[in-house]
UniProtKB/Swiss-Prot annotation:
Main location: cytoplasm
GO biological process, one term: mismatch repair
Annotated transmembrane regions: none
Protein name: Ribonuclease HII
Cofactor(s) the record lists: Mn(2+); Mg(2+)
GO molecular function ontology, one term from the record: RNA-DNA hybrid ribonuclease activity
Location of this chain's protein in the cell: Cytoplasm
InterPro entries: RNase_HII, RNase_HII/HIII, RNase_HII/HIII_dom, RNaseH-like_sf, RNaseH_sf
Cofactor binding mode and count: Manganese or magnesium. Binds 1 divalent metal ion per monomer in the absence of substrate. May bind a second metal ion after substrate binding.
First-tier enzyme category under EC: hydrolase
Source organism of the structure: Rickettsia prowazekii (strain Madrid E)
Catalysed conversion reaction: Endonucleolytic cleavage to 5'-phosphomonoester
Length: 193
């Protein structure tokens, strides 16, 4: 059965709604990226869904359409700050910055996951990238943005195969760490590192 991705946007139809999602939370390397998107309910872009369910090519196409047609913002928290404040706090900070940087101020903020925020406008939705079009759009922006950053870092450190694993703890990545040690972009706070 196809899930209605506009159910939360319809529930809060009297409000300006932003969807927020992150990419890179479980990675061993690099930043965490959060994006916030306010969709235009009168101009729904077809094909938007959770970024993990889309091919790389489809994500790139939708990224261009979303960033050309909707209000959006992205925030990046570096690996060094993740090590200083922990990944959960870094993710929450990235989400809050992405929302604060939107050119239109949302009244309701739908966030993927179960994070708790002091700002009462934030509404956490477990599996939100599969339940809200706004969150799904944000998941695409966050993933494409972070993947592009990881491709740049991979050119500097090709031995870790970040162009394939994007910094996640694949067998090849763990073996590269054992062989070459940690790069300057690895998160020291992660047990795998």
């Amino acid at each position: 059965m196809e899930v209605n991705l506009l159910q939360y946007e319809k529930k809060y139809h009297n409000y300006i709604v932003a969807g927020v999602d992150e990419a890179g939370r479980g990675s061993l390397v690099g930043p965490v990226v959060a994006s916030a998107v306010i969709i235009d309910k009168a101009d729904i872009i077809p094909g938007i869904k959770d970024s993990k369910k889309l091919s790389k090519n489809k994500r790139e196409i939708l990224y261009e359409r979303i960033t050309s047609n909707y209000v959006w913002s992205t925030a990046i928290i570096a690996h060094t700050e993740i090590d200083n404040i922990n990944i959960l706090e870094a993710t929450k900070k990235a989400c809050a910055i992405a929302v604060a940087n939107l050119s239109l101020k949302p009244q309701k903020i739908l966030v993927d996951g179960n994070m708790k925020f002091s700002d009462i406008r934030f509404i956490s939705i477990i599996n939100g990238d599969n339940l809200s079009l706004s969150i799904a759009a944000a998941s695409i922006i966050a993933k494409v943005t972070r993947d592009r950053l990881m491709l740049e870092l991979s050119a500097e450190f090709p031995q870790y195969l970040w162009h394939k694993n994007y910094g996640y703890g694949t067998r090849e990545h763990i073996e590269a760490i054992k062989t070459h040690g940690l790069s300057s972009y690895h998160r020291r706070s992660f047990k795998s590192c």
